[in-house]
Amino acid sequence: MIKIILISLALIFVIIGALISALAAIGLLRLEDVYSRAHAAGKASTLGAMSLLFGTFLYFIATQGFVNMQLIVAIIFVLITGPLSSHMIMKAAYNIKTPYTKKTKVDEISEDLKDTKL
């Protein structure tokens, strides 16, 4: 009974992760500037990849009966590097003065960086 529940939960997490990753891909195609695209990639794809890995983790627990430490390390790695990489992409784009979309009205970064040099 527990095995069926764990496999069902694993399937749900894999489907949710695939849907979130697909939404991130759509966001990369539809959004207008590099900042919005990096935001979509950093947030949604990180959550999608973590859901996929957690579903795989649950599947291994249900079918093989042990905890796969490689998946735990991969989940932690994605959790740390996904948002960090999108932040660095946006920071590099800001430093080379990549233009915003016309809908962007506020530049909060310039207000924060008046006294500091990047």
UniProtKB/Swiss-Prot annotation:
Record bears the keyword Cytoplasm: no
Single GO MF descriptor: sodium:proton antiporter activity
Highest taxon, organism lineage: Bacteria
Subcellular location: Cell membrane
Keyword Zinc-finger: no
Activity-regulation annotation: Na(+) extrusion is completely inhibited by the H(+) conductor carbonyl cyanide m-chlorophenylhydrazone (CCCP).
Record-annotated membrane-spanning stretches: 7-29, 44-66, 71-90
Entries under InterPro entries matching the protein: PhaG_MnhG_YufB
GO CC terms of this entry: plasma membrane
Keywords on record: Antiport, Cell membrane, Hydrogen ion transport, Ion transport, Membrane, Sodium, Sodium transport, Transmembrane, Transmembrane helix, Transport
Membrane protein topology class: Multi-pass membrane protein
Subunit comment: May form a heterooligomeric complex that consists of seven subunits: mnhA1, mnhB1, mnhC1, mnhD1, mnhE1, mnhF1 and mnhG1.
Family assignment from sequence similarity: Belongs to the CPA3 antiporters (TC 2.A.63) subunit G family.
Function: Mnh complex is a Na(+)Li(+)/H(+) antiporter involved in Na(+) and/or Li(+) excretion. Na(+)/H(+) antiport consumes a transmembrane electrical potential, and is thus inferred to be electrogenic. Does not transport K(+), Ca(2+) or Mg(2+).
Protein name, entry field: Na(+)/H(+) antiporter subunit G1
Species of origin: Staphylococcus aureus
